[in-house]
Amino acid sequence: MGDKWIGAALSDPLRILASPLVILRRDDDTKTLENIESLVKTHQPDLLIIGLPISLNGTIGPQAEKVKSFSELLSRHLNIEIIYRDERFSTDEARRKMNDSGKNNKTVRDDAAAAAVILQDYLDETNPPCCQP
């Protein structure tokens, strides 16, 4: 969640695969809340996974505090659980995946792809493999 853009991603119903959904322009908190509320009403997620921009040294800096403040407002407004995930290197991973898939980074914004990376990390961590040998 940046100051100008918010990437959104969804998982499949089985919570196995995350996919980029949309990129929202972040104009002001009221408009941003309305846009996210519309997505939540449409897709009815159980919870929201929010990328937290933790500093490279592992500390919570001013940008992460801004994200947490807005996320708390979002949670109260939508009455939905928020789970924070470290978003360090998610954009780099998203760009690598887009490049590997042949998508041109100049024409595709990477915010939603980074959101999918963050969500996929959460899904992989919380869902054990379905089939153990």
Swiss-Prot record:
Coiled coil: none annotated. The keyword Iron-sulfur does not apply. Transmembrane segments: none annotated. It is found in: Cytoplasm. InterPro entries: RNaseH-like_sf, YqgF, YqgF/RNaseH-like_dom, YqgF/RNaseH-like_dom_sf. Its main location: cytoplasm. GO terms for molecular function: nuclease activity. Its EC number is 3.1.-.-. The keyword Hydrolase applies. One of its GO terms (biological process) is rRNA 5'-end processing. GO terms for cellular component: cytosol. It comes from the Bacteria. Keywords: Cytoplasm, Hydrolase, Nuclease, Ribosome biogenesis. Could be a nuclease involved in processing of the 5'-end of pre-16S rRNA. This is Putative pre-16S rRNA nuclease. It comes from Dehalococcoides mccartyi (strain CBDB1). The lineage of its organism: Bacteria, Bacillati, Chloroflexota, Dehalococcoidia, Dehalococcoidales.
